[in-house]
Amino acid sequence: MKALNRAGWRTGSADEFIGLKREETALVNMRLSLAEKLRGRRTKLGLSQTELALRLGSSQSRVAKMEAGEVDVSLDLLVRAMLNTGASAREVAQAIAAA
């Protein structure tokens, strides 16, 4: 990076590039961490996205969006899905803290 800076290039993070505020970056990271943990729990339980969707009263496409960390999925729904797969409140908190 130093070489790029010396050559006149400006360097920074992806967050800086797209102009995210600190709290927005934190929310993105929390969402992605919960999404990753949810997918891991679902697959460990041997559930398909459709099966998890039925347990949540949702759709397969919504579960796919949850697991992709889509911005239009609420953190509430991600937490509810984690709890539905048997995650404890502590495990949910650890996923958020890992962000």
Task: List the model feature ranges, each with a label.
Residues A7, E36-E51, R55, R80:
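Short basic helix-loop element that most often maps to the first helix and adjoining turn
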Residues L54-D72:
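Recognition helix of helix-turn-helix/homeodomain-like DNA-binding domains
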